Swiss-Prot record:
It is an enzyme of class 2 (transferase). This is UDP-N-acetylglucosamine--N-acetylmuramyl-(pentapeptide) pyrophosphoryl-undecaprenol N-acetylglucosamine transferase. GO terms for molecular function: UDP-N-acetyl-D-glucosamine:N-acetylmuramoyl-L-alanyl-D-glutamyl-meso-2,6-diaminopimelyl-D-alanyl-D-alanine-diphosphoundecaprenol 4-beta-N-acetylglucosaminlytransferase activity; undecaprenyldiphospho-muramoylpentapeptide beta-N-acetylglucosaminyltransferase activity. Belongs to the glycosyltransferase 28 family. MurG subfamily. Gene3D superfamilies: Glycogen Phosphorylase B. It catalyses: di-trans,octa-cis-undecaprenyl diphospho-N-acetyl-alpha-D-muramoyl-L-alanyl-D-glutamyl-meso-2,6-diaminopimeloyl-D-alanyl-D-alanine + UDP-N-acetyl-alpha-D-glucosamine = di-trans,octa-cis-undecaprenyl diphospho-[N-acetyl-alpha-D-glucosaminyl-(1->4)]-N-acetyl-alpha-D-muramoyl-L-alanyl-D-glutamyl-meso-2,6-diaminopimeloyl-D-alanyl-D-alanine + UDP + H(+). UDP-N-acetyl-alpha-D-glucosamine binds at residues 13-15, 124, 165, 193, 294. The gene is murG. It holds the Pfam family Glyco_transf_28.
């Protein structure tokens, strides 16, 4: 049964695309055709995206104070808006769903201007700039960590959680395995879809400072940027520590599930995925985010005992080595953290968001949806 087209708008980074991918799976399973509109930067993350068609429209970030660059950005957004209008007029989607970031601005502005039911999904605990710009225009605001009943858009906010991909739900079925005694200890290090240069320096330096007995137990999976990869590999090879180092892992959910401990950033998708899978984590929020959204995301998980949060400026190699040594020597404490993480997970977020999309596409309201949701 073909229920019509739902157009998803997501781009910029994998953090915006992954929840859109999860929603796409859910919508297609219930009979919708799903199209994705994105930007050129995000195309490398769309290989497994279950869209019937993928469309690329121009977009740009408005942040520069340079008048020439600002003019170029505005022109690119205007070009994207015109392209999005043509696309929507041709597809005639039943609804348009945006997942944040400036690549969603042209499609959502076009959709709301053309009277198409529209929704934005905010993954973080703090609403991003693009979503703030769009929130007053759309019918509903779905929140990964946003609470219901507070804020300027309380009446239209639904706390759906962040949808996670089928691979994450599958990985959630793998129970946590504490590494007691001399058992191998798998450390997984990643920094979001673009890697984290800080970890490429800090983690190998910390491993250098571990006792030989601990290093002999250690196996590392680490995401590193292409320019950092060879240097990271060289350190682990010198130490005799088995390590897989790559800019991007296609099977990240499975690697998270196999970990005894994670060291990672705290983007919304990352926090949502590790909580659904249920693994202990050292979270190091990205320190340069304008809205400090990663710190807020991390705090939500730490409040349930599912993670330890450390500011990057406070995480020296010596301190990280001590944290690793303590973690490797206390498997019961890590098991408790894993349980705390799992308690915060929302594995049904994709289903709930799909129900909201269907309700708004059918002409219902957020108030009616809240009365009937299950």
């Amino acid at each position: 049964m073909d229920k019509g087209i739902i157009l998803l708008a997501a781009g910029g980074t994998g953090g915006h695309l992954f929840p859109a991918e999860a929603l796409a799976h859910e919508l297609k399973a219930t009979g919708y055709s799903v199209h994705l509109v994105t930007d050129s930067r995000a195309e490398r993350f769309t290989g497994k995206f279950p869209a019937d068609e993928i469309h690329v429209v121009p977009s740009a970030t408005i942040g520069s104070k340079n008048p020439v660059k600002l003019a170029r950005s505005v022109w690119k957004l205007w070009t994207g808006l015109r392209a999005a209008r043509r696309l929507i007029a041709r597809l005639k989607p039943r609804a348009v769903v945006g997942f944040g970031g400036y690549p969603t601005v042209p499609p959502l502005l076009a959709a709301t201007g053309m009277g198409i039911p529209s929704i934005i999904h905010e993954q973080n605990a703090v609403m991003g700039r693009a979503n703030k710009m769009l929130a007053s225009r759309v019918k509903a605001v779905a929140g990964g960590f946003l609470p219901e009943g507070t804020g300027a858009f309380a009446a239209k906010t639904v706390a759906t959680g962040n949808p996670v991909r089928p691979a994450v739900l599958k990985a959630a079925g793998v129970p946590y395995a504490p590494a007691a005694g001399d058992a191998p200890f798998h450390l997984v290090v990643f920094g979001g879809s673009q890697g984290a240069q800080f970890f490429s320096k800090a983690v190998p330096q910390a491993v250098c400072r571990l006792d030989d007995a601990l290093r002999q137990r250690l196996k590392v999976t680490q995401q590193a940027r292409p320019e950092d990869r060879e240097g990271v590999i060289a350190v682990y090879e010198k130490l005799g520590v088995p390590a897989e180092v790559s800019p991007f892992f296609t099977d990240m959910a499975g690697r998270i599930a196999s970990a005894q401990l994670l060291i990672c950033r705290s983007g919304a998708s990352t926090v949502s995925e590790i909580s659904v899978i249920g693994r202990p984590a050292i979270l190091v929020p990205y320190p340069y985010a304008l809205d400090h959204d990663q710190a807020a995301n991390a705090a939500a998980l730490a409040a349930k005992g599912g993670a330890r949060v450390i500011a990057q400026v406070e995480l020296s190699a010596e301190r990280l080595a001590g944290i690793l040594a303590d973690a490797m020597s206390n498997p019961d404490a890590l098991a408790q953290m894993a349980a705390g993480a799992r308690q915060t997970g929302k594995p049904d977020a994709a289903r709930l968001l799909a129900l909201l999309v269907e309700a708004i596409a059918s002409g219902s309201t957020v108030a009616k949806f809240k009365e009937t949701r299950s």
